[in-house]
Every structure is written in C-alpha cells, then in structure tokens.
Amino acid sequence: AGVSYCATCDGAFFKDKTVAVIGGGDVALEDALYLANVCRRVYLIHRRNELRGTKVLQAQVFENEKITFLGESEVMEILGDKQVTGIAVHHKASDETKRIALDGVFIAVGMEPQSALYEPLMNLEHGYVPAEEDCATKRAGLYVAGDVRTKRLRQIVTAVSDGANAVCSITEYLTTNDKEGRLGKPC
C-alpha cells in the first residue's frame, strides 16, 4: 500500500504526510499542486532537468514551498514491505543515489494524449481535442471520448462516462440526419 496513480482519488489518505509524485507533464504538476494542499511535503521527481508541463503550472509548482523538485532523477526503488516507507532516488548528474523517507508515491508518467489522428482535422488545445460534455467536436459528425478530450479530470470513470455520452450523441446525430428513416430513436 502507498502507491497510487490518482492523486484526487487517494490524496486524502496521505493528509499531513510526505509523498512523491513521479513525472514532469501537466498531470504530474497538477497532482503535486493538489497534494501540496493535503500533504505536509511533496517531492516532484522527474528524469529530466526541465519539466514538460505548461509554464503556468510550472510557475505554481516552483512557487509552492511544500513542493521540492528533484530534476535529472529517477526512482530506483520503492522501499517498504507492505507499506511504502521511502524511495531510493538516483540523481543522474552527480551519479548519487539517496534514500528519502516518505509515506506514498503517486505515479504520473506516460499520460500524453494520443491525438495525432485529429491534428489534420482541427486545432488541438495542448495536444487535447476540444469537445464539450456531449463529446462533439466543432466538426459535424466527429466525436471524441476519453482522456484525449479537453476536460478537467482524467480518470477511468470519466473516460467511461465520455464513452456513454459519445454513443448517445452519435446516435442522436445519426437519427437526426437519417433521411431514409432506417435508424431508431436516439437516447
């Protein structure tokens, strides 16, 4: 216990504790900022010296006294038997490995939207496809669902919800544009 992939889901379990967030993109920065409101201390660990998240989020992270950034670093080991007690972090530039005592690890890596399919069709917003809650894009008949869509929260439950909304919206679109009357009623 102590390893999580969702700061908003599990952050409350670490109230007033020390945690690490692994990653350097927007999700990692958002997680670190969220956890800084709950936890005593947050380590943000990234394999590069520069973060990849938006400049606005980077500024907020660096201004937050509860967040310590460890760049050019990789987590080599999560310590503890049944509960996380710390991590071993290797700093690439100095070639040193140190142990940090902490209570939880939040993994926020590899969360870039797979939106290349949409690039020729529309302008993306930071790599995400702009769409409202009904999952409709600005192009008639083109819908998007899941974490590739612009939205506030990216979790499995919201991706599944997007799928249901998209199906309902697509059905409505198809039946509205069904000139021959072959389709049934919309949702």
Model-inferred region functions:
Residues 17-18:
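Residues that mark the start of a beta-strand
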Residues 23-25:
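Glycine-rich Rossmann-fold phosphate-binding loop(s) that bind the pyrophosphate
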Residues 28-29:
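N-terminal Rossmann-fold NAD(P) dinucleotide-binding loop
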Residues 32-33:
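Generic hydrophobic/aromatic pocket-lining and core-packing "Φ" positions
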Residues 36-133, 172-187:
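A Rossmann-like FAD-binding core segment of flavoenzymes
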